[in-house]
Swiss-Prot record:
GO molecular function terms attached to this record: ATP binding; metal ion binding; protein-exporting ATPase activity
Species for this entry: Campylobacter concisus (strain 13826)
Name of the protein in question: Protein translocase subunit SecA
Domain of life: Bacteria
Key word Translocase present: yes
Gene: secA
Catalytic reaction equation(s): ATP + H2O + cellular proteinSide 1 = ADP + phosphate + cellular proteinSide 2
Note on how the cofactor is bound: May bind 1 zinc ion per subunit.
Organism placement in taxonomy: Bacteria, Pseudomonadati, Campylobacterota, Epsilonproteobacteria, Campylobacterales
Length: 868
């Protein structure tokens, strides 16, 4: 009550923040006449003067903000024929301060972004603008690029599909770079797999503006970015598990109100938490079907995991809702946008389980080579900002996870859209009939209608019903997303009826003419409440842009997933009490609030899941940053590894004596010299005379082994000059580091999969995960030291005479081959070629010629062997 009175007197915190910005807007507006009088050239000169002051650090960005915003607005009027409204200036200031600007649909977020983008690009450190798809990235870069270029700033765009380093480097070196969230994230991961600093494409993380920030930082937060490679694991287990899963029967959980009650069936599905529990009866049945004694023995761990995933595939994942089958492949449908996620796969074997379920080719499992999350990627930026039409419902998460404050920007013109109460029916059939009747009424008077659905399946049901009713319409879902912009652009035409999944063309405005305005504007009909209120608000926001009239209403049923799982008991009781007959609906603010409470429950569950994911990834992220920082040190051309290699030899020798138990029972003279020498030969390819090691104390033995290895190593390296030696050491060391990191990620995946079971032992899984992951990381560090010594010792370089002889023989062979017919029948692979042996093209050639690799053995044509 007190807080309510306080708000009425002083306004909300958001109102007070906006008032502060309004004062500054007046100052910017006062500068407008000054800049209007300037010629184009004078504007450019003034901009360059301000830019020089920023580069020389004579002024801060905040000190010149008024001038820059006024200048940019004037330039926009001349170049784009668009003038920034006062509320757009407020939006620009919010973004510049590293906050989220919540701006309604049609308020011109793309134009708003130009203000902070240009201001921050003046430092020359680069600005990234992130969008949800390639179409919007290209469109915005092209349209706004005219303004940027007018002021002498360069702009480029990162698109999916092309991985040419030089093209991407040029794009990132531009003052302003547009692209999608996934491309920025994957480029970061790929950069940390490079073997030369000059091959990296990104140049740092200075300032980023994330468009549709709720979609990227909230909806996509549970989706890790993973670069993976193939494994050699068999796929038969997925087929066996699928066959067994089909023979198990779904049951019901024990009744908590009945003591002694037991679950029925072979497994229980918890739709609320999206988990499956196999009952004791189910375990026994599965063991018989698999032909094993104990399904949960360590030797059957993979089999039990496959069964869990097969049961999830059959009971929690629905075709045309969670995925589609396209061209013989299972393709994920993004639950928040309704778009197909081409190239993305479910992890932990779930995707293979879905492929087995659908009877399509099962693609091999992959192994993680590099990974991160959007949460940790975007938190690397010195300044992070975002804009969207719907952020307030997730303000707590933005604050806790990203330290981002949400500011709601007033609309330029008041919203005239009428949002009606929900209509709730008992069954889906009744609901869909009511929707068709309502669409028919609107269509007959010419009012355009956009019908929103939660899945492809529902959109196709409505499509068939509208077809039977003889109502012409368009359908927009993941199966025909290529026409997305075209279909959405026509949705506001008189008499248009459009069915759309959640994708609903974000970023594409639905414009209406005066005739449609007189008919009441665009009519939004939602056929199901989404788990997130934001998605519903986005659908509503398609109507009523920039003061246009419009209307929205949701049609629900007790059979809808949200109400069925989270909240229908209370609503059903109300409907029964009111005596609602078949075909009748209930419309009540109380019921609408009950639905919103159900949504809040789900949002809370999802928030906890994302927070949980981040807590675990924060552990991995610290390790990731350590490894990537070390990699960067190795890539530095001035970094000399000699001291590090010498230390590692001592570590290797110490570890060798300790793990091989050369000293028995603490007796220093009782060790097996022959065994020790054979281990060193196997590890390092170095033969050591036993007499050199006899009679030595422990410390002397460590020192002697390290010394012998150093002498032998220096002998091999003598055929190379200093620069070549450094390059070879770095390349080989990086290969060892990457292999060790890859193995570490695999071990971390295994650890994460089973760590939840520690909770049954009254231990905090997160604390246990931190302990275990630290131990694994220390093992990685130890393995890196010893494996690097082995790799560097075992490498052999050919002498100049051997190289020349091999080159002569290969040249003769190639000349003979020119006179022989080509044989395409025997298409064997070069089994010796592996990515690890790839030499960077600009590195000195290891042959000792002094030339770059690309100008020597890296040339096309006959290649000389480098590693003997």
């Amino acid at each position: 009550m007190i807080s309510s009175v306080f708000r009425k007197i002083f306004g909300t915190k958001n109102d007070r923040e906006v008032k502060k910005y309004i004062k500054r807007v007046a100052q910017i507006n006062a500068l407008e006449p000054t800049y209007e009088k300037m010629s184009d050239d004078e504007l450019k000169i003034k901009f360059n003067e301000l830019k020089a002051q920023v580069v020389e650090e004579k002024v801060t960005l905040d000190q010149i903000l008024n001038d820059v915003f006024a200048l940019v607005r004037e330039a926009s009027k001349r170049v784009l024929k668009m003038r920034h409204f006062d509320v757009q200036l407020i939006g620009g200031m919010v973004l510049n301060e590293g906050r989220i600007a919540e701006m309604k649909t049609g308020e011109g977020k793309t134009l708003v972004a130009t203000l902070p983008v240009i201001l921050n690009a003046m430092s020359g450190k680069g600005v990234h603008v992130v969008t949800v798809n390639d179409y919007l990235a290209k469109r915005d870069a092209t349209q706004m690029g005219e303004l940027y270029n007018f002021l002498g700033l360069s702009v480029d765009v990162i698109l999916s599909g092309g991985y040419d380093d030089e093209v991407r480097q040029a794009a990132y070196n531009a003052d302003i770079t547009y692209g999608t969230n996934s491309e920025f994230g994957f480029d970061y991961l790929r950069d940390n797999m490079k073997f030369e600093a000059g091959q990296k494409v990104q140049r740092g993380h200075n300032f980023v503006i994330v468009d549709e920030v709720d979609s990227i930082l909230i909806d996509e937060a549970r989706t890790p970015l993973i670069i993976s490679g193939p494994t050699n694991r068999t796929l038969d287990g997925y087929i066996r598990a699928d066959q067994v899963a089909k023979q198990l029967t779904r049951g019901t959980p024990a009744d908590p109100n009945m003591p002694g009650s037991k679950p029925t069936g072979d497994f229980i599905v918890d739709e609320k938490n999206r988990t499956i529990m196999i009952t004791e009866a189910g375990i026994s049945k599965a063991e018989k079907l698999f032909g094993v004694e104990n399904l949960y023995n360590l030797e059957n761990a993979v089999l039990s995991h496959h069964l869990d995933q097969a049961l999830k595939a059959h009971n929690l994942f629905e075709k045309d809702v969670h995925y589609v089958v396209k061209d013989g492949e299972v393709v994920i449908v993004d639950e928040f946008t309704g778009r197909l996620s081409e190239g993305r796969r479910f992890s932990e074997g779930l995707h293979q389980a879905l492929e087995a379920k659908e009877g399509v080719k099962i693609q091999e499992e992959s192994q993680t080579l590099a990974d991160t999350t959007y949460q940790n990627y975007f938190r690397m930026y010195k300044k992070l900002a975002g804009m969207t039409g719907t952020a307030q419902t997730e303000a707590t998460e933005f604050s806790q996870i990203y330290n981002l404050e949400v500011i709601s920007i007033p609309t330029n013109v008041p919203v005239k859209r009428i949002d009606q109460n929900d209509l709730i029916y008992k069954t889906q059939n009744e609901k869909f009939k009511a929707v068709i009747d309502e669409v028919k009424k609107a269509h007959e008077k010419g009012q355009p209608v956009l019908v929103g659905t939660a899945s492809i399946e529902r959109s196709e049901v409505l499509h068939e019903m509208l077809k039977k009713a003889g109502i012409p319409h368009s359908v927009l879902n993941a199966k025909n997303h290529e026409k997305e912009a075209e279909i959405i652009a026509q949705a506001g035409v008189k008499g248009a009826v459009t069915i759309a999944t959640n994708m609903a063309g974000r970023g594409v405005d639905i414009r209406i003419n005066d005739e449609v305005r007189d008919l009441g504007g665009l009519y939004i009909i939602g056929t199901e409440r989404h788990e997130s209120r934001r998605i519903d608000n986005q659908l509503r926001g398609r109507a009523g842009r920039q003061g246009d009239p419009g209307m929205s209403r949701f049609y629900l049923s007790l059979e809808d997933n949200l109400l069925r799982i989270f909240g229908s008991d209370r609503i059903k009781a109300i409907m029964d009490r009111l005596g609602i007959d078949e075909g009748e609906s209930i419309e009540s603010r109380m019921v609408t609030r009950a639905v919103e409470n159900a949504q809040k429950k789900v949002e809370s569950l999802h928030f906890e899941a994302r927070k949980h994911l981040l807590e675990y990834d924060d552990v991995a992220n610290e390790q990731r940053k350590t490894i990537y920082k070390y990699r960067d040190e190795l890539l530095d051309k001035n970094y000399d590894m000699s001291e590090k290699i010498a230390q590692n030899r001592v570590e290797y020798a110490t570890n060798l004596l300790d793990t091989a138990e050369i000293f028995h029972g603490g007796l220093k003279d009782d060790y097996d010299i022959k065994n020790l020498c054979s281990i060193i030969l196997a590890d390092c390819g170095e033969e050591i005379d036993e007499s050199e090691l006899k009679g030595l104390e422990y410390n002397e033995l460590v020192e002697k082994i390290a010394q012998i290895l150093e002498v032998r190593y220096n002998e091999k390296m003598s055929v190379l000059n200093e620069e070549q030696r450094k390059d070879i050491e770095k390349i080989l060391y990086l290969q060892v580091l990457d292999n060790a990191w890859r193995e570490h990620l695999y071990q971390m995946d295994i650890l994460k999969t089973g760590i939840g079971l520690r909770g049954y032992n009254q231990k905090d899984p997160l604390v246990e995960y931190k302990k275990e992951s630290y131990n694994l990381f220390m093992e990685l560090v130890g393995r890196l030291k010893t494996e690097s010594v082995k790799t560097l010792q075992i490498v052999r370089f050919k002498s100049r005479e051997e190289q020349e002889e091999q080159a002569r023989m290969m040249l003769e062979a190639s000349q003979n081959a020119e006179n022989e017919p080509l044989n395409y029948n025997n298409q064997g692979e070069d089994e010796n070629f592996t990515p690890e042996k790839k030499i960077p093209r600009n590195a000195p050639c290891p042959c000792g010629s002094g030339k770059k690799y690309k100008d020597c053995h890296g040339k096309s044509g006959p290649k000389k062997g480098i590693f003997a």
